[in-house]
Amino acid sequence: MAIPVPVGLRPGGSVLSAPPRRAGSVRRTTTMDFTWPDGLAGDTVLDGRGRDLRTNGDGTATVLVEASLAMVTDPRRIIKEIGSIPNLPTLRSLAGESAMPGYRRRLAATPAAAAAGTPLYQLLDDVPGATLVSGAAWQRWYDMDRYLELKADVRHRIMTDVCTGYQHGSSALQPDGTLRWSQDRQPAVDIDAVDDDLAWHRHARPEGVTMRRARRIDVWVAGPVIHVDAFFQDSSTLPAGGRQSIHEYTLTAEADRGTGTVRTLTPVPRVLPYHECPLAVSNVAALAGLPLSELRGAVLERLRGPLGCTHLNDMMRALADVPDLAQHLPPASGS
């Protein structure tokens, strides 16, 4: 059985990662590349990078800030090593703790929380969600039975109502609530497949089995409206070459320039693993009228469990940084 999904919500496939940069705009890009030097049973190495870039009214570009995050986690997803540029020595307090359950609470309790609104904090905040999906990179490199043997803890986990795609009655689930593991994958349009050397920051390009989370947020102002155009892609390498897209969304939004409140929020599913996943888009109206700056917390409160997609939620939570990005727009952008 499957839950009906309106035709207009069904994913349309992977797309170009970025439009031409708009004069008078600010663009944030981040990437998180995961590798496993000693194989699936070994440590996971994260190379995270980010940049804020302003495109001035005359089309020239100014790098506002760059950041990087390095992390090593063990097979239990416990943080073994962590470091960043700019250097935040207090991050070392996260070593020995989980990169998933409780991570964001512990991060918020450190002085690193003062970096909120920056590319570095975006990378730090993204650790649990990106870590959660990273192991999916291996599914095309192993026979599925062998993969599930190695991931026995995941195979037997009850997933009912964890998210929209796993809601009760979803075709993603076995009758006992475990996953069917019949997932849709689509060829990924590489994020660098755009005719602009400055479209993205310089990111890692590891070989072999890798997973990448890539994000882009473009911000500009026209009259009384803040405009947002965003992109989100989880992708992994394939044994035969190229990449597959695992989760991919685009999104546009408008907010009031004076108050920062959300006027419109329109996510578009591009690639998702299960038939019911796109239904999460129908629930984003719950965020209308909220200040952008409150989205990081409000998304988790209003779109939890079967009301939301974990990855779309992460995409929308990042819009809390739009007011900070808008502060760096060139003066002419609103004229």
PLM ranges: what are they?
Residues 2-190, 236-335:
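Active-site- and interface-proximal helix/loop "cap" or "latch" segments in soluble metabolic
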